[in-house]
């Protein structure tokens, strides 16, 4: 994942900042609790493709940032 891309790309729902989860290969929107998959190195920024995160997952991401 190119970290320069993270400066440009935003959540398609709220236009907020995304965080990269290297282990799960996802871009995380903490505001909307959505995890967008990265397939073959390409972020899939479609809301229907995003995984809904639990509150525990979001809190875990917050403690790691």
Curated annotation (Swiss-Prot):
It holds the Pfam family Trm112p. Gene3D superfamilies: 2.20.25.10. One of its GO terms (cellular component) is cytosol. InterPro entries: Trm112-like. Belongs to the UPF0434 family. This is UPF0434 protein VF_A0426. The lineage of its organism: Bacteria, Pseudomonadati, Pseudomonadota, Gammaproteobacteria, Vibrionales.
């Amino acid at each position: 994942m190119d970290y320069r891309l993270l400066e440009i790309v935003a959540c398609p729902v709220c236009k907020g900042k995304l965080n990269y989860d290297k282990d799960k290969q996802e871009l995380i929107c903490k505001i909307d609790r959505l995890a967008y998959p990265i397939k073959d190195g390409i972020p899939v920024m479609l809301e229907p493709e995003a995984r809904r995160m639990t509150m525990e997952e979001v809190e875990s991401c917050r403690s790691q940032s």
